[in-house]
């Protein structure tokens, strides 16, 4: 599974692989939803809350990354194996063990391999499941509790989560030649001033609050006033 490329928004091949595994081990109502999440249910007795166990399919590595697996000692190494492909494998193993033992919890267990957790994916898969993008439909299951497997460490459970907002901002102008059109508004200058002001934001220590300007782009040449940034 580690050798299936799966950058955010391009997890289709890994999703198909996981769907096949869900079918093979015997999960019920196996499907891929409208945004690419893979879902399978192990039904409970109907006497308790439904719990979703989830792990994300995408990785931070772009297409073309060498995904050769190597072994050193008792460890395996491969881009994406830690975040989060190992967790998908663990989730499948849990489902397989429960089915093999015919073990049923009181409520349904919903196994989910969710898409677009990383970076610009902006939690798209989970937001869809819980209706945050206003596109969720009746295909999204009712969930009372959600457990995400996304850490190589053991011995603890994080029971609160950090909220996040991501913004893409574009500054535009008419552009021109840096000599002939000198003095017209320059989107790059405007962006620079905005970033400088953002850097002055005062945020609380508790709850921990952070911000970051991560990527900036703009301009076409050294003697051109950019039309956008």
Model-identified regions with their sequence ranges:
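Acidic-enriched catalytic cores of C-N bond-cleaving enzymes acting on peptides and small amides
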Residues: 181-225
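Short glycine-enriched loops at secondary-structure junctions
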Residues: 55-60, 66, 152-154, 161-165, ...
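Acidic/histidine-rich catalytic neighborhood of metal-dependent amide-processing enzymes
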Residues: 75, 80, 84-164
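Predominant activation on well-ordered alpha-helical scaffold segments within soluble catalytic domains
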Residues: 16-19, 88-96, 127-130, 168, ...
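A short, glycine/Asx- and small/polar-enriched loop/turn
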Residues: 44-49, 163-164, 223-229
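Acidic/His- and Gly-rich active-site-bordering loop/insert found
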Residues: 1-79
């Amino acid at each position: 599974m580690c050798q299936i490329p799966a950058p955010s928004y391009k997890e289709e091949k890994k999703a198909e692989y996981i769907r096949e595994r869900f079918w093979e081990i015997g999960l019920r109502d196996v499907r891929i939803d409208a945004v690419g999440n893979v879902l399978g249910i192990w039904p409970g007795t109907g006497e308790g809350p439904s719990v979703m166990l989830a792990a994300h399919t995408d990785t931070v590595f772009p297409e073309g990354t060498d995904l050769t697996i190597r072994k050193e000692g008792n460890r395996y190494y491969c881009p994406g194996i830690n975040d989060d492909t190992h967790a998908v494998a663990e989730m499948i193993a849990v489902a397989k063990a429960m089915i093999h033992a015919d073990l049923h919890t009181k409520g349904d267990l919903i196994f989910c391999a969710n898409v677009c957790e990383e970076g610009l994916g902006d939690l798209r898969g989970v937001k869809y499941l819980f209706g945050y993008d206003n596109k969720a439909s009746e295909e999204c299951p009712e969930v009372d509790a959600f457990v995400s497997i996304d850490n190589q460490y053991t011995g603890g459970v994080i029971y609160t989560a950090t909220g996040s907002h991501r913004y893409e901002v574009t500054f535009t102008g008419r552009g021109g030649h840096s000599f002939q059109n000198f003095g017209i508004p320059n989107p790059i200058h405007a962006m620079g001033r905005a970033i400088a002001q953002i850097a002055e934001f005062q945020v609380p220590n508790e709850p921990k609050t952070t911000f970051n300007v991560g990527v900036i782009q703009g301009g076409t040449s050294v003697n051109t006033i950019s039309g956008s940034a």
